[in-house]
């Protein structure tokens, strides 16, 4: 479960078994976990986050998308 970024209370990561799916990240804070596709950026599941938090998370992803995609490709060898 590689962590690729931490911003404030949020941890951005993917699971080692995720390579069969389209490129995405999971976002965790406390007991909440959301999932966001990266190409294009699109919310898959909100995981209990509020709309305002999802908005913040999506803005973070927009600003770090390239680095997240690079981390995915480096890890999975794409």
Where are these regions (language model features)?
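C-terminal structural segments of small proteins and small subunits
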Residues: 49-78
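Detector for methionine-enriched segments
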Residues: 1, 19, 68-69
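A short, structured beta-strand/loop element
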Residues: 15-49
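Negatively charged, low-complexity tracts enriched in Asp/Glu with abundant Ser/Thr
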Residues: 1-10
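Generic preference for hydrophobic/aromatic residues in regular secondary structure cores
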Residues: 4, 43-45, 64
